[in-house]
C-alpha cells in the first residue's frame, strides 16, 4: 500500500501574504508520535527501568499524553511546513503563523486521524512600475558660495583655539560654560530621563540643547543659579518629551573662552600641514567644491529615486519593513562596538524600542526604493555580468590579502554585484529622465544642511543613540570624579 502524501493548498492573501492549508495523513501523525516517544525514552530516567528500556505505557503515564502529543505536534508542523515550501517552491519572508493557534490544534490532535491546519506567511511582493522612462523631476540648482571657505577657516580656528578661564564677566555666546542642571516636567514634577548632570562642558552656541537653554545661561556669572522654564520641541528625539513643558535648575560652575589663533602661515602649517595660508585656502576651496558637486549629484539622484518609487505598485508586507528596521539597529550597534563602546549597556530595551519607532519611516522608504530599483532592473533587463564583478573584485585584492580576519568571498561578491547593479540603474535613470534645474542663491552652510537632510543615511535613531552614548560618557566622567 502506497504511503499517503501531504496535501498542500495555497491561497494568496492581501499585503503579499500567502495561506497554506495542509492536510497531514494519519500515518504520518502516528509515526511522528512513536518517534517522539522513542526519542524521549532514550533519555528519560524512571526508577526501576534501564535507560532506553522504558515501556511505552509507563512512559506515557509518567510524561503525560498531552505533553507527548505537544512534542510530536511541533515536529509535525515543522516538517510539513518545510515539505510544503519545497512542493510549492515558495521562499517565505517570515516565520509561519498558525491560524487557529497551537493549543486549539493540540486539543483536536489524534495520531489515529489525519490532521488539518492552516499556516500563513509573508512572501516577496509582485512588482510593477507604472512608468520607467521619461520621468521628470525639478531640483534647486545652488551655486557654490566662496564665503564657505572663510566659514571653514573660522571653524578650524575654533578647533585650534586655546581655552582660557574667564572670571571677570558674565557668560556670552561662544563661551564654554561648565554647568550643573536638573530637569523635571512641569505638569507632573517627574524628573526628566537624562535631564540631570553634575558637571557638563557646554559650548554656548545657538541650537545646542533644547530651545532657550543656551540663551538662559547667557549673562549668568560663575556661582549663579537660575530657573529656566522651557518647552521640548514637537520633533524631539525622545517621544515621551515631545511638546512638554519643563523646568531646569541650572548653576554656572565655571566659565572659559576660546583664544583664536591668528590666520597666517603659521596657522596653515599647524592646522593643515600647508606652507602658507594661501595654499591652505586653496586646498579647503578644492575640498568644498568637490563636496558641493557631490551633494548636487546626490540631490539629483534622490529626486530621481523618489520619482521612480512613486511609480511602484506593490503590496509590501510588514515583515520586510521589520527586517529593514532590525538591520538598521544592528548596523548602528556594530558601529558603536567598533568605537569601543559598551553596546549592551547603551542599547537598553527602551532605546531599542525608541530606535525601532524612529527608524521605521526611513526603513519603509528604503524598502520601497530597493523594490522600485528591482522592478526597474526586471522591466528594462538591466543586469551585471560576471566579468564586471571580477574586475571590481580586483580593487579588494590587497585588502583581502592583508586582512587578519577571514573574508566571506561569497558575501563580498553579492555586495559588489548589488552595488554595481545600483550604479547601472541610476545611470539608466539619469539617461532616460528629464531633470529641470531651478537656480537659487544660498549659503554653503544652508546647502550643506539641505544636502544632509536629503542624502544622509544617519537616521534620527542614530542621533538618539549618539546622544545616549554622550550621556553615558558624561555619567562615567562624573563617577570617576
UniProtKB/Swiss-Prot annotation:
Subcellular location per the Swiss-Prot or TrEMBL entry: Cytoplasm
Pfam families: FKBP_C, Trigger_C, Trigger_N
GO biological process: 'de novo' cotranslational protein folding; cell division; chaperone-mediated protein folding; protein transport; protein unfolding
PROSITE patterns for the chain: FKBP_PPIASE (PS50059)
Disordered as annotated region, ranges: 435-481
Alphabetical keyword list: Cell cycle, Cell division, Chaperone, Cytoplasm, Isomerase, Rotamase
A GO CC term attached to the entry: cytoplasm
Keyword Nucleotide-binding: no
EC number of this enzyme: 5.2.1.8
Domain PPIase FKBP-type: 174-261
GO MF annotation list: peptidyl-prolyl cis-trans isomerase activity; protein folding chaperone; ribosome binding
Protein family according to the UniProt entry: Belongs to the FKBP-type PPIase family. Tig subfamily.
Protein name per UniProt: Trigger factor
Species of provenance: Prochlorococcus marinus (strain MIT 9312)
Higher taxonomy: Bacteria, Bacillati, Cyanobacteriota, Cyanophyceae, Synechococcales
Amino acid at each position: 500500500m502506497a504511503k499517503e502524501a501531504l496535501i498542500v493548498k495555497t491561497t494568496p492573501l492581501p499585503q503579499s501574504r500567502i495561506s497554506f492549508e495542509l492536510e497531514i495523513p494519519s500515518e504520518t501523525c502516528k509515526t511522528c508520535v512513536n518517534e517522539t516517544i522513542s526519542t524521549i525514552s532514550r533519555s528519560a530516567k524512571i526508577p526501576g527501568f534501564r535507560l532506553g528500556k522504558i515501556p511505552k505505557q509507563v512512559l506515557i503515564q509518567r510524561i503525560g499524553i498531552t505533553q507527548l502529543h505537544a512534542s510530536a505536534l511541533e515536529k509535525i508542523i515543522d516538517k510539513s511546513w518545510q515539505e510544503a515550501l519545497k512542493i510549492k517552491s515558495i521562499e517565505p519572508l517570515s516565520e509561519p503563523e498558525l491560524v487557529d493557534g497551537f493549543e486549539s490544534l493540540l486539543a483536536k490532535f489524534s495520531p489515529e486521524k489525519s490532521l488539518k491546519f492552516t499556516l500563513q506567511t509573508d512572501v516577496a511582493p509582485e512588482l510593477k512600475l507604472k512608468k520607467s522612462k521619461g520621468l521628470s523631476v525639478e531640483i534647486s540648482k545652488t551655486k557654490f558660495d566662496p564665503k564657505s571657505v572663510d566659514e571653514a577657516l573660522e571653524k578650524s580656528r575654533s578647533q585650534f583655539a586655546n581655552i582660557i578661564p574667564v572670571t571677570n564677566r558674565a557668560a556670552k555666546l561662544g563661551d564654554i560654560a561648565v554647568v550643573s542642571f536638573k530637569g523635571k516636567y512641569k505638569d507632573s514634577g517627574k524628573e526628566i530621563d537624562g535631564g540631570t548632570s553634575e558637571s557638563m562642558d557646554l559650548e554656548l552656541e545657538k541650537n545646542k540643547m533644547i530651545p532657550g537653554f543656551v540663551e538662559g545661561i547667557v549673562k549668568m556669572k560663575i556661582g549663579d543659579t537660575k530657573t529656566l522654564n522651557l518647552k521640548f520641541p514637537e520633533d524631539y528625539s525622545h517621544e515621551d518629551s515631545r511638546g512638554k513643558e519643563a523646568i531646569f535648575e541650572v548653576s554656572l560652575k565655571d566659565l572659559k573662552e576660546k583664544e583664536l589663533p591668528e590666520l597666517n602661515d603659521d596657522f596653515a602649517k599647524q592646522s593643515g600641514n600647508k606652507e602658507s595660508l594661501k595654499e591652505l585656502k586653496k586646498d579647503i576651496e578644492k575640498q568644498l567644491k568637490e563636496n558641493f558637486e557631490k551633494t548636487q549629484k546626490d540631490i539629483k539622484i534622490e529626486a530621481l529615486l523618489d520619482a521612480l518609487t512613486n511609480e511602484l505598485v506593490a503590496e509590501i508586507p510588514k515583515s520586510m519593513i521589520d527586517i529593514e528596521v532590525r538591520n538598521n539597529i544592528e548596523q548602528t550597534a556594530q558601529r558603536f562596538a567598533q568605537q569601543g563602546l559598551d553596546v549592551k549597556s547603551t542599547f537598553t530595551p527602551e532605546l531599542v524600542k525608541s530606535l525601532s519607532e524612529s527608524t521605521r519611516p526611513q526603513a519603509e522608504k528604503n524598502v520601497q526604493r530597493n523594490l522600485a530599483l528591482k522592478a526597474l532592473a526586471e522591466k528594462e533587463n538591466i543586469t551585471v555580468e560576471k566579468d564586471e564583478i571580477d574586475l571590481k573584485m580586483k580593487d579588494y585584492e590587497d585588502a583581502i590579502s592583508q586582512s587578519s580576519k577571514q573574508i566571506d568571498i561569497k558575501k563580498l561578491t553579492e555586495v559588489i554585484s548589488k552595488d554595481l547593479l545600483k550604479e547601472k540603474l541610476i545611470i539608466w535613470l539619469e539617461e532616460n529622465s528629464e531633470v529641470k534645474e531651478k537656480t537659487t542663491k544660498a549659503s554653503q552652510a544652508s546647502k550643506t544642511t539641505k544636502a544632509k537632510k536629503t542624502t544622509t543615511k544617519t537616521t534620527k535613531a542614530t542621533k538618539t543613540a549618539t546622544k545616549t552614548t554622550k550621556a553615558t560618557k558624561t555619567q562615567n566622567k562624573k563617577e570617576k570624579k
